[in-house]
Every structure is written in structure tokens, then in C-alpha cells.
């Protein structure tokens, strides 16, 4: 199964694509969709949707896993939530099944406890995907963690 993991954001959307076969998981791609902070939010969201469509067409995932947020405390967070809505809409337009996980559930799935720090999650991602070097940037590594959680929680 091919899974696209997404770590939503307005400035950077992390993505990670994994392929699973039996008990093996392989990283196919990871990176970020970066938007220019000097452009209007609407244009940035159009850019996110466009680049995400390209990723979906290129990798043809069978499942999308997206990090879910629960707390909205600042105007910056509102923009992230809006960008997440663009991600969900774009995935839905391709008819992809979508699973969503809050950060604590992702940490639990990868490390066995929901209060893991970033380094513990990164180590788990590297172990599960047999990576010798950490995926960069952090948003891409986070997206791979989301994709792995999608696989583990299926």
C-alpha cells in the first residue's frame, strides 16, 4: 500500500510517501511544499493545492494520513487550520481515503508513549524506514511519522 503523510502548515506543508509490503515499509519521497510569506494567504493556499495535486498524480497513493489539530490559540494557528482545510479538500477531490491523527496518537504509534519528544519520534521513523540519515526538514520527517501511523493504525 502506498501512503501519503501530510504535516499541514501555511509556510511549509511537510509530505512523506511510503510504500508498505507485509511488515516492510520503504520511504519513496519526502519534502516540503513551501509558500512565500510575502504573498497573500489565498495565493499561498492555491499553491499548496497545486503542488499537492502534483504529488498525488506522481505517487498515486492509496491512503492519505493527515496530522489533526485540536487547539486554536492564535491568528497564525488559524492560517494553519485553513491550509489544512485546503489539504483535506485536495485529497478528497482525488477520492483518497483520509485518516487523521492528533500528535499524541502519532507519538504513541511510533514510540509506545504519547509524550515522546521530537528526537524519539525521529529515531522511530528512521528505524521503521531503515534510514541511515534523518529525513529533512523536520516537517518532512513529521509527515513520514504521520504516514507510518496511517499504516500502523489501518
Swiss-Prot record:
Molecular function in Gene Ontology: crossover junction DNA endonuclease activity; DNA binding; magnesium ion binding
Membrane-spanning residues: none
Active-site residues, Swiss-Prot/TrEMBL: 7, 67, 139
Predominant subcellular localization, coarse grouping: cytoplasm
Localization terms from the record: Cytoplasm
Keyword tRNA processing belongs to the record: no
Co-factor note (free text): Binds 2 Mg(2+) ion per subunit.
GO cellular component terms given for this protein: cytoplasm; Holliday junction resolvase complex
Subunit record text: Homodimer which binds Holliday junction (HJ) DNA. The HJ becomes 2-fold symmetrical on binding to RuvC with unstacked arms; it has a different conformation from HJ DNA in complex with RuvA. In the full resolvosome a probable DNA-RuvA(4)-RuvB(12)-RuvC(2) complex forms which resolves the HJ.
Identification of the protein by name: Crossover junction endodeoxyribonuclease RuvC
Species whose genome carries this gene: Synechococcus sp. (strain WH7803)
UniProt gene name: ruvC
Amino acid at each position: 500500500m502506498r501512503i501519503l503523510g501530510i504535516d499541514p502548515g501555511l509556510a511549509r506543508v511537510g509530505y512523506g510517501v511510503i510504500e508498505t509490503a507485509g511488515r516492510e515499509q520503504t520511504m519513496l519521497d519526502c519534502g516540503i511544499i513551501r509558500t512565500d510569506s510575502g504573498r497573500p494567504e489565498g495565493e499561498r493556499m492555491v499553491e499548496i493545492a497545486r503542488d499537492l495535486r502534483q504529488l498525488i498524480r506522481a505517487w498515486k497513493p492509496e491512503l492519505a494520513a493527515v496530522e489533526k489539530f485540536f487547539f486554536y490559540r492564535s491568528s497564525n494557528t488559524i492560517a494553519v487550520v485553513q491550509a489544512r482545510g485546503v489539504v483535506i479538500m485536495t485529497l478528497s477531490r482525488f477520492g483518497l481515503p483520509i485518516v487523521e491523527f492528533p500528535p499524541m496518537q502519532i507519538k504513541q504509534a511510533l514510540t509506545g508513549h504519547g509524550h515522546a519528544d521530537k528526537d524519539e519520534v525521529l529515531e522511530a521513523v528512521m528505524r521503521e524506514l531503515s534510514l541511515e540519515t534523518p529525513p529533512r526538514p523536520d516537517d518532512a520527517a513529521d509527515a513520514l511519522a504521520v504516514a507510518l501511523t496511517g499504516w500502523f493504525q489501518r
